[in-house]
Amino acid sequence: MDFIVAIFALFVISSFTITSTNAVEASTLLDIGNLSRSSFPRGFIFGAGSSAYQFEGAVNEGGRGPSIWDTFTHKYPEKIRDGSNADITVDQYHRYKEDVGIMKDQNMDSYRFSISWPRILPKGKLSGGINHEGIKYYNNLINELLANGIQPFVTLFHWDLPQVLEDEYGGFLNSGVINDFRDYTDLCFKEFGDRVRYWSTLNEPWVFSNSGYALGTNAPGRCSASNVAKPGDSGTGPYIVTHNQILAHAEAVHVYKTKYQAYQKGKIGITLVSNWLMPLDDNSIPDIKAAERSLDFQFGLFMEQLTTGDYSKSMRRIVKNRLPKFSKFESSLVNGSFDFIGINYYSSSYISNAPSHGNAKPSYSTNPMTNISFEKHGIPLGPRAASIWIYVYPYMFIQEDFEIFCYILKINITILQFSITENGMNEFNDATLPVEEALLNTYRIDYYYRHLYYIRSAIRAGSNVKGFYAWSFLDCNEWFAGFTVRFGLNFVD
């Protein structure tokens, strides 16, 4: 397998200007000047990301146990667009030194990757035994990164729950997962924390809850529909899973702060995904409230808990007794349980009000009472990438829009530390294209350039953005999309 450097000249060149591109409609083209490393504050981190399931491969090697994604892709290949799995994917387990060499050549400051829970604890629990071969692999990866001047940014859970815990008690549907996650993260802090300065407990917990338990499109594939992998309840399951995820996060943060942070000197946070959700009709009060409601049910679903210790009032009003409750102790544990927030931002959408249907079966997907669209008056909000959910819209980081976003969520943007932990666009994986043509990355360069330009603007306006991680470092397995799309900065044949 050959890795071919496709782009991310942003890491290595001094400056450049884009004044035109085929990626954006002519009417939206802007000459937005030069960007270089010196355009950003000293110490600003540039990196790229990955996850264990999507990159490592070697699913049956080195003592690793199966994850829910292994089961999902093997048992229900029809749920994956091309019927593929990540048994091999880009084989980082065996090729990590080569990968780190590419990172060094591209002048990356940091590499964001996740640890595979079932590679460390194949039985899911400490009592089931520690896989020291898995510990050795991550030690080797971390040491190789540091030897090449690259800072590891470690995610502790990127959706690959040990299958044994799903079988034993239903995984994140059961509060038993909280203590097991705490023990797993404690082990990671102990083994790797002397060299890891940035920890993220969970990656996109909203996607894990929504896609895995409301829509059934992701592992473990539970929802109310009849054509899914496992039966579930789309009206209660996602809320239970969300509740247990946030408590697991808070327990992990508590362990780190009380046992390790004082002498390891690292920081710990969580990585959340959000679109910039705009009212379809700027003059419609119902649409404006719908956009705020939609934000409450996505980014705010977790951010509200992290900053207040409870769910938002709008969620309590709509979901009622289907929404779990925190005890006073749990609320105090959750409130403020982060040093930083990672934001994964890809795109935006228009939101309009959708009155509830009284007789409809409750579902997380319909609870916000909104409709989502990507165009207004027949005009798309931006060019579309390969995935139907990515329309190029970098303007969330314009000062006014970003301040509105933070105001709605009651976030002080000058105090809260956060990084853009994922940002990117994909293209279709067209095997008929010559490599030379596949490497023409005008669209992707333009996408990153514009987002970085507006992120710089947000920083200059007072936002405390500390870093930027492109998604993804390499083309890789993209969950239910399999290998049908490419997000990578680097082309993989």
Swiss-Prot record:
Residues spanning the signal sequence: 1-18
EC number: 3.2.1.21
Family indicated by similarity: Belongs to the glycosyl hydrolase 1 family.
Residues involved in a beta-D-glucoside binding: Q54, H158, N203, E204, Y346, E422, W471, E478, W479, F487
Active site feature: E204 (proton donor), E422 (nucleophile)
SUPFAM superfamilies membership: (Trans)glycosidases
GO molecular function, a single term: beta-glucosidase activity
Entry's Gene Ontology BP terms: carbohydrate metabolic process
Distribution of this protein across tissues and organs: Leaves.
Keywords (A to Z) from UniProt: Glycoprotein, Glycosidase, Hydrolase, Signal
Sites where a glycan is attached: N34, N335, N371, N412
Catalytic function, reaction form: Hydrolysis of terminal, non-reducing beta-D-glucosyl residues with release of beta-D-glucose
One Pfam family matching this protein: Glyco_hydro_1
Protein name per its UniProtKB record: Non-cyanogenic beta-glucosidase
PROSITE patterns in the record: GLYCOSYL_HYDROL_F1_1, GLYCOSYL_HYDROL_F1_2
